UniProtKB/Swiss-Prot annotation:
It comes from Homo sapiens. Gene3D superfamilies: Ribosomal protein L30, ferredoxin-like fold domain. The modification Phosphothreonine is found at T17. Residues 7-54 are annotated as: 4 X 12 AA tandem repeats. The modification N6-succinyllysine is found at K127. CDD domains: Ribosomal_L7_archeal_euk. GO terms for molecular function: DNA binding; identical protein binding; mRNA binding; RNA binding; structural constituent of ribosome. This is Large ribosomal subunit protein uL30. GO terms for cellular component: cytoplasm; cytosol; cytosolic large ribosomal subunit; cytosolic ribosome; endoplasmic reticulum; focal adhesion; membrane; nucleolus.
Length: 248
């Protein structure tokens, strides 16, 4: 009787397969926790880096502005005129249709990625691009955007070209995946590269989908007349910023 009772009290052995399964599950859980922790630390480090970059850019922009003011004051004090450096960046907006226009004009508008009315793009200014703008000047409004305009356009209307699709830039991770190899990992990097026309301007600008702007508040005056004659077409220099405000 005692032998039977002892047999009843014995705990059945756990099968080896179950032990292995439990061990594998525990190891997998540890790996997942480690990966989750590593990702959390990476996000934290990236947020800190983005914050530091934004702070650095703000300081750089402020320094650029102060230098311009100082140079203008020095020139005025010496009785001279201060001539700012030639603009390196333009923002171009298509304002007219192209029915009946020459193939050359049509081709240039395609090269500028202005396929629809009220599309806008950034353009790096050089001899070749200025000649292109002159060819299509009756069909575009363009000028020199300030930092505020570049910032607001990208933050409010910025879409990226990701896998040939138009994707809203709602997360810095989208920018990092596409432009991280060029050192551009966040919105502030993208804005800085465009505004300063940096070494990777071409890659940054091609990543940005052409901006789809709204019809300007108050409407257009005369699309077929040049800006200097009271119309809308052509180079309006710094006044492009007012038009951007009306269309953004």
């Amino acid at each position: 009787m005692e032998g039977v009772e002892e047999k009843k009290k014995e705990v059945p052995a756990v099968p080896e397969t179950l032990k292995k399964k439990r061990r594998n599950f525990a190891e997998l859980k540890i790996k997942r926790l480690r990966k989750k922790f590593a990702q959390k630390m990476l996000r934290k480090a990236r947020r800190k880096l983005i914050y530091e970059k934004a702070k650095h850019y703000h300081k750089e922009y402020r320094q650029m502005y102060r230098t311009e003011i100082r140079m203008a004051r020095m020139a005025r004090k010496a009785g001279n005129f201060y001539v700012p450096a030639e603009p390196k960046l333009a923002f171009v907006i298509r304002i007219r249709g192209i029915n009946g226009v020459s193939p050359k004009v049509r081709k240039v508008l395609q090269l500028l990625r202005l396929r629809q009315i009220f599309n806008g793009t950034f353009v790096k200014l050089n001899k070749a691009s200025i000649n292109m703008l002159r060819i299509v000047e009756p069909y575009i409004a363009w000028g020199y955007p300030n930092l505020k305009s570049v910032n607001e356009l990208i933050y409010k209307r910025g879409y990226g070209k990701i896998n040939k699709k138009r994707i809203a830039l709602t997360d810095n991770a989208l920018i990092a995946r596409s432009l991280g190899k060029y050192g551009i990992i966040c919105m502030e990097d993208l804005i800085h590269e465009i505004y300063t026309v940096g070494k990777r301007f071409k890659e940054a600008n091609n990543f940005l989908w052409p901006f789809k702007l709204s019809s300007p508040r108050g409407g257009m005056k005369k699309k077929t007349t040049h800006f200097v004659e009271g119309g809308d077409a052509g180079n309006r220099e710094d006044q492009i910023n007012r038009l951007i405000r009306r269309m953004n």
